[in-house]
């Protein structure tokens, strides 16, 4: 176990970052069947592309609950952290760099899948569950729950982007020089995650109730995102 997580065993309370690490350690998302199959070159290419076509709908939706959440942040200074993230999700005004467009281009390079084909793909119940929980939490729950949930998903996606990007290249589905989207998010989402956690850092230190809300969001986000990939792998043979 990470040495930082052992602090809790010694009676020392974990800070926000350490709590996030503890949650991720317990979820064990690195052992997810989706990533293990990709790393072990046991993932059929057509099945993988199909799961990524489904993930496209998660990419296109992700900024929408973020926009709802930004409106709930109590101060403009903290709100800017989320607004900046929202703006970057939209390519900072450059439509070619909007994240759903770079992901669509990756699908084209990897599987010769054009955007029209992707848009004609029916949404799986697993992606709908993911998207609905995101927007429901950001709309109805305390903003601290939503911020923590979105922050840990961004943190996980930075790591997951590296895993998937390397897996795509190792399987020779896309050449390294032609990789797009995942190589950007491997580094960008570290910053995005920090933006979210900066919003709730002060809240974390103010009260036990705030800690409870934030822990709820961290656990929800980690379990939700890990389950999405497990469900995508489980349904990889389906063609929606």
Describe each PLM feature range.
Residues 2-240:
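Non-heme di-metal
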């Amino acid at each position: 176990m990470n040495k930082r997580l052992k602090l809790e065993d010694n009676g020392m309370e974990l800070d926000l970052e350490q709590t996030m690490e503890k949650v991720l350690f317990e979820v064990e998302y690195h052992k997810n069947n989706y990533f293990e199959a990709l790393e072990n070159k046991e993932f059929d290419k057509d099945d993988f592309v199909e799961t990524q076509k489904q993930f496209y709908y998660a990419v296109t939706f992700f900024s929408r609950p973020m926009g709802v959440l930004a409106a709930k942040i109590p101060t403009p200074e903290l709100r800017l952290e989320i607004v900046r993230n929202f703006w970057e999700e939209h390519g900072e005004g450059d439509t070619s760099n909007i994240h759903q467009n770079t992901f669509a281009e990756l699908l084209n390079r990897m599987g010769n899948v054009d955007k029209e084909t992707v848009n004609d793909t029916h949404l799986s119940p697993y992606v709908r569950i993911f998207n609905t929980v995101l927007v429901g939490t950001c709309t109805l729950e305390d903003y601290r729950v939503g911020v923590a949930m979105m922050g840990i998903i961004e943190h996980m996606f930075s790591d997951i982007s590296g895993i998937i990007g390397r897996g795509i290249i190792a399987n020779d589905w896309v050449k390294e020089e032609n990789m797009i989207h995942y190589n950007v998010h491997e580094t960008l989402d570290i910053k995005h995650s920090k933006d979210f956690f900066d919003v709730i850092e002060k809240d974390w230190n103010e009260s036990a109730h705030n800690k409870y809300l934030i822990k709820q969001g961290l656990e929800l986000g980690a379990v939700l995102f890990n389950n999405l990939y497990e469900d995508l792998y489980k349904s990889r043979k389906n063609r929606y």
